[in-house]
Amino acid sequence: GGTPFSCYPAMMKQRGDRFFTEGINNTLLHVYISQPSEEREPGMNAWFSSEFNRLNTWYPQMDLFTSYLKRVNYMLQQGLNIADVAYFIGEDAPKMTGIVDPELPKGYQFDYINAEVIERDLFVKDGLLTLPHGTQYRILVLPKLETMRPELLAKIKKLIEDGAVVLGPAPKRSPSGESYQTADRQVEKLAGELWSGLDGRSVKAVKRGKGELLFGMTMEEALKHIGCVPDCGLPADAPVLYGHRAAVDADIYFISNQKDETIELRPEFRVRSKQPELWDATTGRIRTLPAYEETAAGTVVPLKLYPYAVSYTHLTLP
């Protein structure tokens, strides 16, 4: 937004950092237009996007910004993303995103997941919903929709019986015209088997096989019910966003101050027996953080974040 040529890296950084906490880990410059003339400034340009080219006033300093982006991309490509919750986006028209409902409390991360991945890839390992590459989730959340194909509902039933935890309402019919009426009866039968005795008011949780089905709970209630403490404990009003990657020998927490003011906080990371280090994505410097405290749930690390600053808290084996 804004007037033409008014956007500069300091403005882009805050928004970019927010996207990094949402899972983006491979950035590009949009747009970079070739400039054939030395005399005409600002040169050839587009009416959309931001201008990255040699006639831009801040081009001589742009390497500071691109070096920052490269460091962030590299760190966020290490290991696996840590998210406790997978929100199923439903089976409506194809979509790239979904909604977060029930709302996720601060200190937890989530992924969206679609029907294809659930049916083809998702399985249960050690009581956790697991994907073939290793990513795991504590809870699968179903959207507040009345439709689900019987094949997908059968797979979700198997996941629960194998040990998964699923939160959400019962579907009533199939969204597909395939096997019309027969599919609706299959959905009704499967839903009856799963949600029987679960009204979301007096009864909000039922065991099914090795797993559990929840209904009528907030995310706070559901996470507490399964004993899942925050991955990054933060004050509810802290203007901070975070992301977490787990590599072979280290946990990497990306902490972003989204406000134009200096803040001090004491995040509690759900990691123990590791030495915290501060990896500065702006300068590339690394330093050990000696002032930390281990708790029953994790590690508390005092941090001071300058306006719109980012902290990589890298916890590694001593």
Go through each PLM region and give its residues:
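Carbohydrate-binding surfaces of carbohydrate-active enzymes
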Residues: G1-L315
